[in-house]
């Protein structure tokens, strides 16, 4: 055995023998490969388990927290302010309370004024109905107030270099709204605002949209009254059936988000080419003076109240087009398919009607042409029969003495034809027909169409009535009359 396989493998634990050195080298190479890549093969199984599949990727994202919504920096402040308003304002939670949106402004609410250098104040309570805050007699370039009933944007931040107006609608609190105005310091000069106001629109999903409102006020002689009239807060209770009252703030917040989305999709963006933020129908920024207030602001005609007037005409057109698109998008696919099939059926019926009319016209034309063709064929048949009869008569009178005499005389002129006609008329009309037929066949001279028609009719009658004795009489009669004409 050892003599047959002298080459022994030197690997530990392997006592195989081979007949030649080549087999041993191949075997050793296998040992080397196993020793070198054995652990790597075991690790490859673990790597395969760590393949980043979509499920594992989503799981890792959830563990890291990428799918969590980012907390808004303003959300805590707004939540605190709304909770304070809910605590301080008594709510009527009786079973007979129904959701009501008051469209009429009855009593004033609180307007807070602070120095421009002071930090942004938190919203205060709006339950003091008779409270008035005196303001310093300072010139203010812009003074605007927003009706909360028509404002559909929950968080709006309006800032400028000289004054800032913060408009806030507390979304969790459906019965409170606060208007805060900051007046500039009295020792600063009033400078007209050259550029537009930067407006920061804060959306409920945590995003901010920068927009701009043009400052069209150029004169600075704006008088601020001694006491700013206060406006009673308008309750923003959503009129949703099945919800008795504003006890749960979460549905109110979702309702506000839905209304904001509807407003953004229904209208064009809130500020385009100098338009101010609009609500559903009457959400326009008004001047601080109202007709029912004794004190008013004296502003020029280029106030911010008149800037939305010109784009108001284009709003219905955009609303109409967006309404059509929205109706088209909201249609049921089954309804779309039904309308599509109905239009197809109507088009197919119209096409079939047109094709039917066209086929009927073609059939009528074919019938007319076939009738005309039948008439022409019958006429051709009659003419052929007549030609055959004339040929038979011609062959019958080929050896007639009148024909031979006419060949001798010649009938060189048409006058001689007429004279022969006059001479032959008293004897018999048959002679006239025979003379004309013989002249036309022997000499090839064409006569008038009238004489041809007469000859044709006479020959037809002769074909019916011709007998041998009659032909002899007809031949003998002109023989005596033809001699004077020849002489």
UniProtKB/Swiss-Prot annotation:
Keywords: Acetylation, Activator, Cytoplasm, DNA damage, DNA-binding, Membrane, Metal-binding, Mitochondrion, Mitochondrion outer membrane, Nucleus, Phosphoprotein, Transcription, Transcription regulation, Zinc, Zinc-finger. Residues 336-356 are annotated as: Basic motif. Residues 334-397 form the bZIP domain. Residues 278-281 are annotated as: Essential for its histone acetyltransferase activity. GO terms for cellular component: CCAAT-binding factor complex; chromatin; cytoplasm; H4 histone acetyltransferase complex; membrane; mitochondrial outer membrane; nucleus; RNA polymerase II transcription regulator complex. The modification Phosphoserine is found at residues 44, 72, 94, 103, 118, 310, 322, 349, 424, 428, 472, 480. Residues 107-130, 241-355, 407-487 are annotated as: Disordered. Its main location: nucleus. The modification Phosphothreonine is found at residues 34, 51, 53, 55, 98. A motif (Nuclear export signal) lies at residues 387-396. PROSITE patterns: BZIP, BZIP_BASIC, ZINC_FINGER_C2H2_1, ZINC_FINGER_C2H2_2. GO terms for biological process: abducens nucleus development; adipose tissue development; amelogenesis; apoptotic process; apoptotic process involved in development; BMP signaling pathway; brainstem development; cellular response to anisomycin. CDD domains: bZIP_ATF2, GCN4_cent. Pfam families: bZIP_1. One of its GO terms (molecular function) is RNA polymerase II-specific DNA-binding transcription factor binding. Binds DNA as a dimer and can form a homodimer in the absence of DNA. Can form a heterodimer with JUN. Heterodimerization is essential for its transcriptional activity. Interacts with SMAD3 and SMAD4. Binds through its N-terminal region to UTF1 which acts as a coactivator of ATF2 transcriptional activity. Interacts with the HK1/VDAC1 complex. Interacts with NBN, MRE11, XPO1, KAT5 and CUL3. This is Cyclic AMP-dependent transcription factor ATF-2. The gene is Atf2.
